């Protein structure tokens, strides 16, 4: 039975991928810094490892693996470029080197659409769009560099592919879903520009579907080898529709407050200045990058991922919101 290594399995996406692999009978090893007791209880192995630390430790953690799903990353909108580079570029370079050292045949990398979002509207872009991350986002800059490393590593011994899931949400999400709900409960949620711009998020099960398809389809010389693919639900909707859908699932009223894009951008600039001045490490309520993201459209064509990986995005937005509401009712998350 093949051994699949999953990095970042304590996170929302990595954990969901690991559970799906275990459910279908794969041998799974979770490699990361924090323990994953819930996944160990399901049969996963666990190796504690700082992927940006010593190369020898990373090589040992990947020993015996047939495939690696590299999901681990430092995400978010706050932190130094050096912090993001260490977690996202250095760690990825060491994962690639460890794959080569151990003769791993397949590497699936979790990237982000932010690698092509320079700050303006992105409507219906496909994978021919050049890498052009917004320099205001250390995360996007570091992920673009890491994706480039992964795609360049594709050769006759190691097949690689990068996936770019967009705005992952669903039960258990501590980022997008949890922040929308928390800010609404605190009376701090605003729709930038009225929430009219189109976005296309990814329900968690669809993100998992794409990763498992990539794992199964990826071989040396396969159509997907060396490529990157956008992943989403395939249902662009106004931002307010998704936001208010999440609020309704949590039993909260829709967001009726808005803020002009220019005002959000100025607020972000001021908060960034204050945060830098105080040396704070927590994320500000607004940054210039977030203001740009919320004030622009960003949705992508899925023709390539459907053609090469057989991706369907089986859970549509309405069904995802129904499942989210059920989760809030039963577990509160």
List where the protein language model places each region.
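NAD(P)H-binding glycine-rich loop region in Rossmannoid oxidoreductase-like domains
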Residues: 44-90, 98, 118
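N-terminal Rossmann NAD(P)H-binding glycine-rich loop of SDR-like oxidoreductase domains
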Residues: 4-24
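Mid/C-terminal beta-alpha module of Rossmann-like enzyme folds, strongest
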Residues: 217-284, 322-325, 333
């Amino acid at each position: 039975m093949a051994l699949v290594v999953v990095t970042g399995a304590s996170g929302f996406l990595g954990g969901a991928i690991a559970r799906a692999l275990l459910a279908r009978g794969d041998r799974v090893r979770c490699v990361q810094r924090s323990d994953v007791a819930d996944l160990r209880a399901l049969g996963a192995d666990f190796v504690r490892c700082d992927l940006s630390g010593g190369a020898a430790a990373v090589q040992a953690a990947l020993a015996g693996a047939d495939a690696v799903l590299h999901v681990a990353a430092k995400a978010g909108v706050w932190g130094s470029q050096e912090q993001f580079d260490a977690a996202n570029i250095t760690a990825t370079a060491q994962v690639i080197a460890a794959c080569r050292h151990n003769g791993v045949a397949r590497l699936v990398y979790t990237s982000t659409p932010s690698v092509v979002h320079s700050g303006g509207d992105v409507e219906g872009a496909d994978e021919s769009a050049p890498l052009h991350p917004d320099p205001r986002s250390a995360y996007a800059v570091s992920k673009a560099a890491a994706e480039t490393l992964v795609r360049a590593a594709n050769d006759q011994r190691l097949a690689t592919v990068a996936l770019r899931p967009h705005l992952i949400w669903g039960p258990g999400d501590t980022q997008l879903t949890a922040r929308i709900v928390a800010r609404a409960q605190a009376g701090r949620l605003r729709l930038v520009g009225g929430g009219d711009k189109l976005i296309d998020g990814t329900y968690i099960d669809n993100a998992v579907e794409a990763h498992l398809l990539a794992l199964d389809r990826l071989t040396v010389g396969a159509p997907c080898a060396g490529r990157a693919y956008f992943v989403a639900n395939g249902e662009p909707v106004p931002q307010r529709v998704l936001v208010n859908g999440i609020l309704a699932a949590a039993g909260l009223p829709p967001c009726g407050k808005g803020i002009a894009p220019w005002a959000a951008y100025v607020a972000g600039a001021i908060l960034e200045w204050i945060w830098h001045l105080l040396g704070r490490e927590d994320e500000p309520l607004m940054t210039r990058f977030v203001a740009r993201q919320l004030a622009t459209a960003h949705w992508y064509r899925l023709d390539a991922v459907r053609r090469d990986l057989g991706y369907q995005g089986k859970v549509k937005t309405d069904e995802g919101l129904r499942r989210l509401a059920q989760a809030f009712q039963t577990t509160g998350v």
